[in-house]
Amino acid sequence: MSIKYVATSKLPTPWGVFAMHGFEDTESGKEHVALTFGTLSADEPVLGRIHSECLTGDALFSLRCDCGFQLQAAMQNIAETGSGFILYLRQEGRGIGLLNKIRAYELQDKGANTVEANEQLGFEADMRKYDMIKPILEQIGVKHVRLMTNNPRKVKAMKEFGIEVVERVPLQVGKNRYNEAYLKTKSTELGHMMSEYHFMDENK
């Protein structure tokens, strides 16, 4: 994989002004973004998140998943902490793409869960790759991470690429009546680390 740094600009948000760093995977043509806030230290643990693109959740306010809620919570947590990063990776639909994601949603509307829908379309449950994170983190100067995630695959990927995960910070937000079954499937079939408290909450 060849990751090329392209440019950096300011990104004003409701939580403060982030810096937006653009990267291109010259082999696949995919474009990725790193958001940074404050001053990042290579010597100290930095609060951060690896976030895969979710057009429906991040931009269209879908309640079928928790992605948009997690992105906003991560940005708010980083701003409140005073520094941090988000790697926004272009891996829509756990790597199957937007149109296939819509096809998977159609199958879910007919009763399949999120894993079954992917498999019925001929895909693995999760096809995301994380080999781009190392060169991006090197560019923004991060070596030690407090990682906001419920996904053990992201923790494993960080460690495999030589990035120290000092702490896993749970990010359990956004549960509602439309996504509760989806979240339970992520917990039971994809191994996401969610507490029973998250499912006992009756605020839907």
From Swiss-Prot:
It comes from the Bacteria. GO terms for biological process: riboflavin biosynthetic process. Pathway: Cofactor biosynthesis; riboflavin biosynthesis; 5-amino-6-(D-ribitylamino)uracil from GTP: step 1/4. Transmembrane segments: none annotated. Pfam families: GTP_cyclohydro2. InterPro entries: GTP_cyclohydro_II, RibA, RibA-like_sf. Binds 1 zinc ion per subunit. Keywords: GTP-binding, Hydrolase, Metal-binding, Nucleotide-binding, Riboflavin biosynthesis, Zinc. GTP binds at R49, I50, H51, S52, E53, Q70, E92, G93, R94, T114, T149, K154. It catalyses: GTP + 4 H2O = 2,5-diamino-6-hydroxy-4-(5-phosphoribosylamino)-pyrimidine + formate + 2 phosphate + 3 H(+). Zn(2+) binds at C54, C65, C67. The active site is at D126 (proton acceptor), R128 (nucleophile). Its EC number is 3.5.4.25. GO terms for cellular component: cytosol. Its cofactor is Zn(2+). GO terms for molecular function: GTP binding; GTP cyclohydrolase II activity; zinc ion binding. Catalyzes the conversion of GTP to 2,5-diamino-6-ribosylamino-4(3H)-pyrimidinone 5'-phosphate (DARP), formate and pyrophosphate. Belongs to the GTP cyclohydrolase II family. This is GTP cyclohydrolase-2. It comes from Shewanella baltica (strain OS155 / ATCC BAA-1091).
